UniProtKB/Swiss-Prot annotation:
Its main location: cytoplasm. SUPFAM superfamilies: Acyl-CoA N-acyltransferases (Nat) (SSF55729). PANTHER family: ARGININE-TRNA-PROTEIN TRANSFERASE 1, ARGINYL-TRNA--PROTEIN TRANSFERASE 1. Pfam families: ATE_C (PF04377), ATE_N (PF04376). The keyword Endoplasmic reticulum does not apply. One of its GO terms (cellular component) is cytoplasm. Belongs to the R-transferase family. Bpt subfamily. GO terms for molecular function: arginyl-tRNA--protein transferase activity; leucyl-tRNA--protein transferase activity. This is Aspartate/glutamate leucyltransferase. It is found in: Cytoplasm. It is an enzyme of class 2 (transferase). It catalyses: N-terminal L-glutamyl-[protein] + L-leucyl-tRNA(Leu) = N-terminal L-leucyl-L-glutamyl-[protein] + tRNA(Leu) + H(+); N-terminal L-aspartyl-[protein] + L-leucyl-tRNA(Leu) = N-terminal L-leucyl-L-aspartyl-[protein] + tRNA(Leu) + H(+). The lineage of its organism: Bacteria, Pseudomonadati, Pseudomonadota, Gammaproteobacteria, Pseudomonadales.
Amino acid sequence: MTELARLKFYATQPHSCSYLPDEQATTLFLDPSQPMDVHVYADLSEMGFRRSGDHLYRPHCQNCNACVPARIPAARFIPNRQQRRILKRNADLTVTAARPAFKEEYFDLYRRYIETRHADGDMYPPSRDQFSTFLVRDLPFCWFYEFRLAGRLLAVAVCDLLPNGLSAVYTFYEPDEERRSLGRFAILWQITEALRQDLEAVYLGYWIKNCKKMNYKTQYRPIELLINQRWVTLN
């Protein structure tokens, strides 16, 4: 483990929670002057931290612990019948790793995805600056995985390649290809890629029991939840 005790962290003032409208949220951030070291990041991911843009953070709320870090142990994952169908349905896609960059092709897909799927969220309306600040970061461990059908871009999974696993930062995809279940397929592909690279887990961020948008995460079994500073398996 990295000497995490030497790191500095800062907490935000309470603000409206993005997921539970009746709650106030507080976020703990790693000191932004701390270099984004991949080993520090990996150690912090074991403690429930996530990356957004150039920042590592985790919830630090006074009166709520609803946000539970979740990860899929790649070697123990077993796809269910629906997931096997999704894998078969998307077997015609090719996946290519690319360095983070701003491309109109990426932004057009991102814009249509946000406008169609998340028009009620805090990422609407999408903008080029928002896209770049959130996703296009010059970090050596960050990758854009492009999912294409005969050259046509259908999805992009933004992932961080860490020593202990893949951290799924964000996925955006073609909203008109609903039958393909591209968001679910992207997670299934990342599990397969983690296995191929002999990585321990795919980190999915936070699961919130009373948030419908988070329900999909527990469809991948077994899944591990960070409870009382221990990763506990949910079969």
